[in-house]
C-alpha cells in the first residue's frame, strides 16, 4: 500500500457564514493561534489554546468553541501527534455548531487523522457522510477524498469499494498520478477485472 501523505488544511483567516458571527477580538485571537502554528511556535500556540479552553470555552457547545476545538486538533496534527488530535476534531463536530462547509473541513481532517493511526473502520463512515453531504449541497468532493476512501477500504481488504473510489480519484485528477494508477491496477488484478487492468497498464 502506498504511503498516504497527511494533508492538513490550515486557514489563513477565519471565515464565518451569515448565520455564524464572531467578534473582532475573537477573530484576532483565532488568527493569532493560526499564525503561531504556521510559524511552528508551538509553545505560544499551546498557551493561547489552553487559555481559551480553560477560561472561555470549557465544555462549550458554541460556534467559537467548535473553532477552538478544531484549532486544537490542527495544533496536534501538524506536529504528527495524531492520537492527541483526534478527540479535539471529534469534539468540534460534536458541538453541531459548525457551518455546514466548516463541518466538512473538520470531517476530512478527522478522517485523515483516523487514517494515520490505523482506524480505517472510522474513516469510511465519516467520508461517506462527507460525500453524501457534498453531493446533496453541491460541495466539491475532491479526488483526495476518494483516494482516502480507497486506501481505507483497501487496508480492510474491502477491494470492491476500494477499486470504485480509486477509479473516481483517477477520473477526477487533473493529470495522471502514477501511484494512483498503479494502485488501481493492483486492485483490478485482485478483483480479476482483466480488461480494466489491461487499460490501466497502458496509461
Q: Where are the regions a protein language model picked out?
A:
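N-terminal leader/linker segments that initiate helical-solenoid repeat arrays
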Residues: 16-74, 78-87, 102-105
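Flexible helix-coil transition and linker loops at the boundaries of alpha-helical arrays
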Residues: 54-63, 94-102, 132-140, 173-175
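Structural register within alpha-helical repeat arrays
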Residues: 32, 72, 110, 149, ...
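Residue-level signature for tetratricopeptide repeat
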Residues: 35, 75, 113, 152, ...
Amino acid at each position: 500500500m502506498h504511503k498516504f501523505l497527511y494533508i492538513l488544511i490550515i486557514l489563513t483567516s477565519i471565515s464565518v457564514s451569515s448565520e455564524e458571527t464572531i467578534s473582532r477580538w475573537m477573530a484576532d485571537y483565532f488568527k493569532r493561534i493560526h499564525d503561531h502554528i504556521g510559524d511552528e511556535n508551538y509553545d505560544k500556540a499551546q498557551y493561547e489554546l489552553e487559555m481559551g479552553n480553560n477560561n472561555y470555552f470549557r465544555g462549550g457547545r458554541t460556534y467559537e468553541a467548535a473553532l477552538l476545538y478544531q484549532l486544537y486538533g490542527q495544533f496536534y496534527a501538524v506536529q504528527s501527534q495524531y492520537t492527541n488530535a483526534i478527540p479535539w476534531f471529534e469534539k468540534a463536530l460534536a458541538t453541531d455548531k459548525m457551518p455546514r462547509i466548516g463541518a466538512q473541513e473538520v470531517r476530512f481532517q478527522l478522517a485523515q487523522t483516523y487514517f494515520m493511526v490505523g482506524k480505517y473502520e472510522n474513516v469510511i463512515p465519516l467520508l461517506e457522510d462527507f460525500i453524501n453531504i457534498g453531493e446533496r449541497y453541491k460541495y466539491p468532493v475532491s479526488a483526495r477524498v476518494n483516494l482516502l476512501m480507497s486506501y481505507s477500504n483497501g487496508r480492510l481488504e474491502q477491494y470492491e469499494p476500494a477499486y470504485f473510489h480509486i477509479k473516481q480519484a483517477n477520473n477526477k485528477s487533473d493529470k495522471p498520478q502514477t501511484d494512483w494508477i498503479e494502485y488501481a491496477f493492483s486492485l483490478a488484478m485482485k478483483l480479476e477485472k482483466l480488461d480494466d487492468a489491461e487499460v490501466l497498464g497502458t496509461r
